[in-house]
Amino acid sequence: MVTFFTKNDGKVSAIAKGAKRPKSKFSGTLEPFQKIAIDYSGRTSLKTLKSSECIEPFKEFCTRKNLYSAFYVNELINCMVKSNEDPIEIFNLYEQCILQLYDDSDTNKVLRNFEFNMMKVLGYEINFQSDYRSGDPLDANSFYTYAPQMGFTISDSGYGGEQLIEIREKKFSKENLELAKQIIKQTLDFYFEELNINSRSFFR
């Protein structure tokens, strides 16, 4: 079974009969990160793959970390996106992210931008604008605690308001990227309890 993410139909799972045979008609076209044109049929959620043609062949990533980051993006898409999601915006975000990962050495920045954008598209956007209790704008001189689904609220200790404002403005220092990663993971773990991202182990 192969899972595709398509621009028009979103996430599609299909059986590629005979794909493992040496002279399979699918040979060389079902590798990760290749842009391909596919034809499939079937009335159920599990389709039958009829043909696949490579449009853009696999390109080597500049580092192993970039490759692992791309696998992480694939797993995130597969876990977060449902079959009935509107695919076009997600497809464009995914394609842009993979293209950046081919050559960009700052994988943390690429991944955090992708995660934030994906959560916004899927309805899980984090509110870095205001305190969810009072409605007041985040204050650079205050501290905040964070609760997924609710947001940030002022506290005696916790995340610094200045850092949160910088993250909102995409001012990604090394420290801000690490904090953004922590907040995103907390959010994803809350909404997707069974989110099992195997490629996370590559970054430990």
Residue locations for each model-derived region?
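Short aromatic-glycine-enriched beta-strand elements
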Residues: 1-3
